[in-house]
A protein has these predicted regions:
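Glycine-rich beta-strand-turn "strand-cap" elements at beta-sheet edges
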Residues: 1-15, 52-80, 105, 109-136
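Short, well-ordered beta-strand segments in beta-rich or mixed alpha/beta enzyme
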Residues: 20-27, 66-105
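Amphipathic alpha-helical interaction segments
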Residues: 46-49, 98, 111
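A short, structured loop/turn motif at beta-sheet edges
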Residues: 48-49, 92-95, 122
């Protein structure tokens, strides 16, 4: 598959998603590799249950930008010992999100991974936000 075809497929997936959930948490640097393993396994399950896309990011800059406060100040992460992670899950619509969430909730492996994940993050650091696509 050519690079342009891959780009077209990714653009189609972006167009058909109308809801994205953002999950943000703090992770001790010593738990980085364990978290990556959990993310890889969870990503496989997410694809199995039809998530349009699941992406993971690590905060790479802690500098403010002009009049914008960097998220690292909002979540109060200790940059020497902790990382800030974000997971994004894309859905077609709220019905798709509900179906996906129900399937994941009934999956023993996903429940096991969720418990491992929650034990590895900094307590009290998990925040979530769901956003709907704006037509601009």
């Amino acid at each position: 598959m050519s690079k342009s075809n891959v780009t077209e497929i990714e653009e189609e997936k972006q167009i058909e998603s109308s809801i994205v959930q953002h999950f943000i948490c703090q992770v001790s640097k010593k738990n980085h590799d364990a978290m990556l393993q959990i993310a890889k396994q969870a990503n496989e399950i997410a694809r199995k249950y039809g998530a349009l896309r699941v992406e993971y990011f690590q905060l790479s800059s802690t500098e403010n930008m002009i009049d914008w406060t960097n998220i690292s100040k909002t979540v109060s992460a200790n940059q020497d010992e902790e990382e800030v992670w974000m997971e994004q899950v894309f859905y077609r619509d709220s019905k798709h999100r509900d179906e996906y969430t129900a399937m994941c909730g009934n999956d023993e492996n996903m429940n096991r991974l969720y418990k491992q994940f929650m034990n590895l993050i900094i307590p009290g650091s998990a925040i979530v936000g769901e956003f709907s696509r704006l037509k601009v």
